[in-house]
Amino acid sequence: MNSIFIDKNLLDFLWNIYETLYKIIKKAKNYRGKVVKKNKRLISFLGVFIMLFSFCFQGNVQADVNTVQSGKIKSGNVTVWEVGNVAKVLADVERLNLNTVNVPIQVDIPNVTSTNMVINQAQKQQAIILIQELLKRNIQVIVEPFPYIQQGNVGETEWNPSNINDFFWNWKTVILQDIFNSITSKYNVYGLKIASNFVNMEYAEGYWSDTIDFVRQQYKGNVLYQMNWWLTASFDSSYEAKFVEKINRPYLKKVDIVSIDSWFEVSGKRNPTYEEVKKSLFATTVYNRGQNVVQQLEQLHKATGKPVYFGGFNVPARELGLQNPWNPDVSNVFSKDVQLNGWRAYRDVLEPKPYFKGFSIWFIGSNDSTHAYQIHSKEAEAVINGWYRK
């Protein structure tokens, strides 16, 4: 299918017209009596223009999915609070040559020990609209029930339910069942993440095996289990033992794709060069740990027999961004080079690996142009755009 694109400058120009006319019509509608009668034709014309423009604006932005290698995932994560930014999501998909979008469904959780959870229905409806628009454009969708703990003030890795049995019962019957009923049974969803960085629950092997069976009964797409990134150190064998235990969980062999929230602490330098980053992927320099990230990814693949996928990944455009990539505010010194060198090194090392399924950029769809996780240079944009290009 041929994809149609609008020139960015023209798009920006039309969008400015759209916003201006929208403000005019909004003000016009506030008048009463004679003023409304006098402006009736103008209001009607502007209303038609806005509807037509909205159709053109969203209808012509399409993913050029034919340029991405078959079987690979080039994705972007949308945050739970930005699923309504449909136009920006689509623009980022085009700009970065993505073929997939990770759409979160907000799961409201009162506190870190809670076993009670509920899907936020208002956010879910926005997510469904985004899913519909993505599927219209042949963009694959991965659905992720995303833990939103204490109104988003606590990260999902902190979730430690007080009763593991109650947790799994509610995760299956309240959360996943809602997603089956309202999303996966109605839309062609490429993948479903059944877990997102549940470090305190991953030990429950029997429960996870049962959950996967439960999911398979109602969903025929790709099942993903997402684990959190890990540390090892050459001077402490206990880290290695935990890693070996992690990758040998039996339930990992039952999913289709093993996903990693990938924030490996690679380089302790403020501004490492491309060559330094590349070398550090085989022996990390932060605290001289010597972690061989590339080798461990291969170990994970061999242990599970499954493709490995970076379900959340980026390099913040900050000095020390490769020391603590999970922290967008690791430094207040902006650095496009750190982001570029990180993306280049990861691409050059992982793109040739047949077991590596792909990646999802954390994040897309945001209008915060200064955020460290935005892609801040044309050079970094080109690296991402070209990854897995046919």
Please describe what each predicted stretch is.
Residues 63-93:
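Boundary/entry segment of secreted carbohydrate-active catalytic domains
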Residues 53-65:
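Sec-dependent signal peptide cleavage junction
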Residues 224, 248, 253-324:
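Glycoside hydrolase catalytic-domain groove-lining segments
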Residues 90, 103-150, 202-225, 281-288, ...:
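Aromatic-lined substrate-binding rim segments of carbohydrate-active enzymes
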Residues 84-89, 174-180, 233-249, 293-297, ...:
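Alpha-helical scaffolding within the catalytic cores
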